[in-house]
Design a protein with these regions (language model features):
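Glycine-centered low-complexity coil/loop motifs and glycine-rich tracts
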Residues: 4-34, 40-42
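Short C-terminal tail/terminal secondary-structure segment
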Residues: 120, 172, 250, 263-264, ...
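Active-site helix of classical SDR
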Residues: 146, 183, 191
């Protein structure tokens, strides 16, 4: 079980972008997307474990990680505002978004990328705590992030783009991670509902559905052991053949940049009339 981040970016060229932006998919989105389309960012991150006082297989993000992301963005010649915020904390998210827009001027693009991963239990054996943390972060956290941002997009009067990070697990089911699957399916419902309601403001809403991504949420001791319980000390090379079985393409996982490229498309003018789309970046996983 681990917590990840959320971030918000202000884009001078195409507006402002909100996304999960401190390492992994979020870091790639922050660095690749805005680098191509604008020059201002707002990044928020939990900067700590999702469950304080506990150790997890996946290292929790830190204030230093967020500062490093900010430095990388600044090195690209862009402005960035950061805040340590948990997406479960709506007042905190709203305050960060409001402050960022006040400092940077506008909001046109939202990428709701924050989320956690856990697994191993059958759904009927999942603890109440694990269920609540998953839904509160991966579903309610997405809703809270978009809720905080939408008034700024509407008031700008320019339309905009909202991109929600779901998962292949938001399009199909897998055993032993039912709370994750339920939350990610819920993200699709959020995407479609926001899309129906916000279309009148020329705000497009879409979702991206990654398969395994080569980040710390996949490459960690707990996941290695989950995929290869037959080995005493499994590593990524031991897990790769199992991961490849999920795909029609002969690869075990995709890279964070593959996700940021999909996000960049949805945020761009090339997708100006694209809304309500569930886009798998899955190496053919949905075909199996």
């Amino acid at each position: 079980l681990t917590g990840v981040n959320s971030s918000f970016s202000d884009n001078a060229a195409t507006g402002q972008n909100a996304n999960g932006g401190n390492g992994g998919n979020g870091g790639a989105i922050c660095l690749d997307g805005p680098a191509q389309s604008g020059d201002k960012d707002i990044a928020i991150d939990i900067c700590g474990p999702i469950r304080p006082g506990t150790e997890t297989a996946i290292p929790a993000s830190t204030p230093e990680d967020l500062a490093e992301t900010a430095d990388l963005v600044k090195n690209l010649g862009r402005r960035i505002v950061t805040a340590e915020v948990d997406v479960r904390d709506y007042p905190g998210v709203k305050a960060a978004v409001d402050s960022g827009v006040e400092q940077l001027g506008r909001l046109d693009i939202v990428v709701a990328n924050a989320g956690i991963g856990n697994g191993g239990d059958l759904l009927h054996e999942t603890s109440q705590l694990d269920w609540d943390e998953m839904i509160d972060t991966n579903l309610s956290g997405v809703w809270k992030s978009v809720k905080a941002a939408v008034p700024h997009i509407i008031s700008g009067g320019r339309g905009g783009s909202i991109i929600l990070t779901s998962s292949v697990g938001g399009l199909k089911a897998y055993p032993n991670c039912g709370n994750y699957v339920a939350a990610k399916h819920g993200v699709v419902g959020l995407m479609r509902s926001f899309g129906v309601e916000l279309g009148q403001h020329m705000i497009r809403v879409n979702s991206v559905h990654p398969t395994h991504v080569a980040t710390d949420m996949l490459h960690n001791e707990g996941t290695f052991k989950m995929f290869r319980p037959d080995l005493e000390n499994p590593g990524p090379d031991d897990m790769a053949p199992i991961c490849q079985l999920f795909h029609t393409l002969p690869i075990p996982w995709v890279e964070a940049r593959d996700i940021s490229n999909a996000v960049l498309f949805f945020a761009s003018d090339e997708a100006r009339y694209v809304t309500g789309v569930t886009l798998p970046v899955d190496a053919g996983s949905c075909l199996k």
